[in-house]
Amino acid sequence: MDPNTPSAQPISFTASDGYLLRGFCWRHPDADARRPVVIINPATSVRCRYYARFAAFLHRHGFDVLSYDYRGIGESRPARMRHFEAGWIDWGRLDFEAALQYAFAQFPGQPVQVVAHSVGGFLIGLAESSHRVSRVFSMGAQYAYWRDYAPARRAGLLFKWHVVMPALTAVFGYFPGGRLGWLEDTPKGVVHDWTARHPRFEDIWRSGGARVLPDAERDELVRRFAAVRADTLAVSVSDDEFGTTSAIQRLLGYYRSSPRTHLHLRPDAIGQTAIGHFAFFHSRFEHDLWKIPLEWLRHGRLPPAPKGEVVALRAEAPGEPIPKPA
């Protein structure tokens, strides 16, 4: 573990299908039912260790924190990756659900909150118990619909992630991202889900795909998103080629019962040259950007005078029809 996070302890817990998941926990010695426990949902194929300094930061400010790796990644990697079966749906329905159950059992009565990066914000809605989450902070949260990629980078991203990545996956039985320096090695099911070209996420698992779910099961997934009522802050940055404003809004549309706030930042407005999709969780932002999630998780509000564009979306009434994202 990172030497600057001495309070982190290794943990393990089992998903409902028996798969063993591993991660780390930053826990205060005294129990306090008022203290929130924060679960960190990583981005696709990013190890939970990447968020260690951020987790330690939250711990120093009074939170209990749990980070973990999805099956196939980092601490939860199997002995053999070739043809290992795992997709986004497993990461959400099984792995994040298991993390929730671990938090409920280990921190009884404490509010459960989530910090989610990229696809981690999408996975929240797939879990059966996600309606019990009280607050969410997400950074660049989306599910990689290709038309939402930044226009200036779209062609290059399509070639890299929608042509080269699946081609290599077909050869190796998984995506060997580690040896290429393209994130971690990634299960083939996750590659399929990432490269599916559907504007609505539930259509990833329609007939003709690598994994097919019955219509009723896919409809149930959409209802799970609508059942989430967590106060949600979704942050996007102008130089994020994946988490564009359209991508963020597309995902937020599914969390229709949650009060949602979208904060869009420009690096130059906060004295930075770049932030992109990954740098938000770098420790150099501890004294500026990290104040945003800290204030949200503590009080459910933005810091005074945030240097960005703010869009608030109301929670919709239960009887309203589920909107169809464009």
Where do the PLM segments sit?
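Alpha/beta-hydrolase-fold enzymes
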Residues: 117-207
